Structure formats: C-alpha cells, structure tokens
C-alpha cells in the first residue's frame, strides 16, 4: 500500500535528503527504519531533494509499505526508531498513483538571516548571521528592504532561472514560476519567503544572496531583469549558506 507522510527534520548533520552510500541522509534514515519495520527493502520518494544542511518543516514523501500496521501505528513505530532530529508528523494512505515529487504543485521555502546586534545563540543553526563581507560599507546592518522587494518583483512570474541555478551542467529545463516573494524584518531577523511551482538546485539560496546584494547597495533592483536575461550564474549574487533555509510546505 502507498503511504503519504509529512516530515520535519533538522538538516544540520545530514548530507542532504537523497540516499548516499556511507553518509547519513534523511531519505536513508527513513528507508532504514521502514526496512526494519517491513523486513523488506523500501524506497521512499521525497517531494524534493534538499541540500546538505537544509531543514524542513513540511517535507512530503511517499513509499509502498507491506505492513498490517495502521497509519498511526506506522507513525509511532517510525518516530520511535528515527533519531531525534527527524520526525514524521503524519501518515495517511495515498492512492496507488500518488508520487510526492511528480504530483507536487508548489513549494514554500523560507530563508532566515540575522541582522541584529546580539548573537542568536539558540537560533544559530537555523539562521545566517550576516557576516561583514555582506554588510560592509553600510551605515548599519539593516538592508534596504524596499529595494529588495522591488527587485523581487522582477522575479515574479514564469522565467528561465538558469542564472540562479547552482548546477551549471543542468540539461533539463530551468524555467520555473515564482508566485510570490515576501521580505520582512522583525526583531533583528530578516525572513525571505519564496512561493513557487518548483525550484532549481541552490535556487533559493542564490536568490537570497542576490537580493541581499540589492539590499546592501551592491546591485540595483533593476539589475534583476538583466540577470534573468543573461542565463549566466556569474551574473547573480553569492549562494547563501544552507543552514538558514527551511522548506515550509509542499502543495498538491
């Protein structure tokens, strides 16, 4: 039977989502637990492949499990054996044709930066404390959020986002649709939320780095148009580190 599950995880100590030999991954941990439960090899399909160090609040996955356990019992069993930094939030029976990645209609990611005066001791694993090389030359650490939001406006819609793709050998289509980008600052935390139909490798992190360059005056908001048109990774800004990124939701 095909089961759909929603998963939260702290990606700090994992080499990303996708199973890899000899290193810990989220998918690998899940498959190992379900193999133990069913005494069979199990393949789990995630809605996306988050990079090493990236976190998720609402990753969706599916897998065929040969078991007599109820969904609630599957959830309880898995959470008992999974490490404390991975949690299955819910399990439901899905249609035989449901596939977490192929059926996904949209994703919401959030990137969090810290621009306050005090070290965010308890959030440091989930927040990028902006270093001096990002904020250098500005009178304070607070970026021009209005300029960043204006720049984000050029990204809304369907575009070729090759300039914002971390894989320069990408042969598949790099066209994606972004529905909305919101940027807000509160009590020293700068949060950028990206809602789209899908995202390329490192895309959200490169968008974040580029928007920060606008916020700190290294690029103009209007430059986004030329960056998109260039289809050249070198035109965009730096790739923000993974630990500030969180997958919030997958839409179906």
Labelled PLM ranges:
Residues 1-252:
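Structured-RNA-binding interfaces characteristic of tRNA pseudouridine synthases
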């Amino acid at each position: 039977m095909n089961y759909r599950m929603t998963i939260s995880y702290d990606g700090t100590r994992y080499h990303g989502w996708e199973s890899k030999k000899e290193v810990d991954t989220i998918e690998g941990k899940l498959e190992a637990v379900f193999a133990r439960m069913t005494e069979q090899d199990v393949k789990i399909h995630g809605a996306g492949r988050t990079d090493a160090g990236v976190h998720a609040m609402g990753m969706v996955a599916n897998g065929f499990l040969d078991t007599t356990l109820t969904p609630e019992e599957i959830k309880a069993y898995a959470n008992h054996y999974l490490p404390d930094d991975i949690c299955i939030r819910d399990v439901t029976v899905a249609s035989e044709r449901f596939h977490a990645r192929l059926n996904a209609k949209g994703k919401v990611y959030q990137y969090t930066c810290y621009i306050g005066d005090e070290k965010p001791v308890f959030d440091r694993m989930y927040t990028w404390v902006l270093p001096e090389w990002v904020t250098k030359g500005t009178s304070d650490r607070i970026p021009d959020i209005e300029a960043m939001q204006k720049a984000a406006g050029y990204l809304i819609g369907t575009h070729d986002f090759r300039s914002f793709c971390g894989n320069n050998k990408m042969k598949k289509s790099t066209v994606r649709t972004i529905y909305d980008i919101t940027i807000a600052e509160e009590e020293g935390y700068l949060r950028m939320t990206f809602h789209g139909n899908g995202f390329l490798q490192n895309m959200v992190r490169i968008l974040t780095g580029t928007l920060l360059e606008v916020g700190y005056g290294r690029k103009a908001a209007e430059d986004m148009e030329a960056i998109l048109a260039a289809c050249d990774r070198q035109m965009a800004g730096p790739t923000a580190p993974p630990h500030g990124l969180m997958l919030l939701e997958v839409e179906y």
